[in-house]
A protein has these predicted regions:
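Bacterial N-terminal signal peptides that target proteins for export
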Residues: 1-8
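Hydrophobic h-region of N-terminal signal peptides that target proteins for export
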Residues: 9-19
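Low-complexity, Ser/Thr/Pro/Gly-rich disordered linker/stalk regions
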Residues: 21-99
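Secretory/extracellular carbohydrate-interaction modules
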Residues: 70-142
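Beta-strand-rich interaction surfaces with strong enrichment in secreted/lumenal proteins
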Residues: 75-81, 152-160, 208-209
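Short, aromatic/His-centered strand-loop micro-motif at the edge of beta-sheets
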Residues: 141-167
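Carbohydrate-binding surfaces in secreted/extracellular proteins
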Residues: 160-194
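Flexible glycan-contacting loops in extracellular carbohydrate-active proteins
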Residues: 189-220
């Protein structure tokens, strides 16, 4: 799996992001903010430049899990949730309703550092309710395109009412990082392709939740072993 990191890619992604935002604006969730003890969040740079913050979304505890009503795309984390060496982190994501006319991704990130800065590092794997998966990240705030958005039979497709559930996990070993959706590896990334100069500092670090904009989710079973 080839890692792509270049200004051309970043520009292309930025253009795509701007086009998507023009088609569908980030919503502003009433009564927004983070009320889960210990948790933090940060919106993507494009949203931040528009004056948006995590207070335009809502993260709260509900039913033993995290209830998320997302406006701008963002990452959410608890600084005490860290993983080092060889590990597995996983969580179950239930998209409770569709807040737009096309699927938006959500999933887990690992290797997080400097998350509350303008130069975050992290690697994330996300699923779409249309049956696709994608692996991407940030290195010092710059986009790391690891694998393209591709269909995978392991990724559940949304029902007619828009609801869908996905279990998403990262399994990190000495030489690679695997993303699993519903128990099946959808991407296997050699560490040499994602760790080093101009890439991630490490797969060690904070783990947490990555969400696109305008999604409603219940997240349960966020665990590490």
């Amino acid at each position: 799996m080839r890692l792509i990191q270049a200004s051309v890619v970043a520009v292309a992604l930025a253009v795509c992001s701007v086009s998507a935002q023009q088609m569908e604006a980030d919503r502003k969730v009433a009564g927004g903010g983070i009320t889960v003890k210990g948790w933090q969040g940060k919106v993507d740079a494009a949203a931040a430049k528009q004056g948006k913050t995590v207070n335009d979304s809502k993260l709260m505890e509900m039913g033993g899990g995290l209830h998320m009503q997302v406006g701008p795309a963002a990452v959410y984390w608890n600084p005490s949730n860290t993983a080092t060496g060889e590990y597995t982190v996983k969580a179950t994501f239930k998209e409770t309703k569709v807040a737009s006319d096309h699927p938006h991704p959500y999933g887990l990130f690992i290797g997080g550092s400097k998350l509350d800065s303008e130069t975050p590092n992290l690697l994330y794997c996300v699923a779409y309710g249309s049956g696709e998966a994608l692996v991407r990240g940030f290195s010092e705030g710059k986009v790391l395109q690891v694998s393209k958005r591709v269909p995978n039979a392991a990724v559940n497709k949304a029902a007619a009412d828009g609801g869908v559930t996905q279990e998403i996990a990262w399994n990190v070993t000495a030489d690679k990082a695997d993303c699993l959706v519903n128990g099946t590896v959808v991407a296997s990334v050699p560490k040499a392709e994602i760790v080093g100069a101009g890439k991630l500092e490490s797969t060690d670090g904070v783990y947490g939740i990555r969400v696109s904009h305008n999604v409603d989710l219940m997240v349960t079973g966020l665990t590490k072993k």
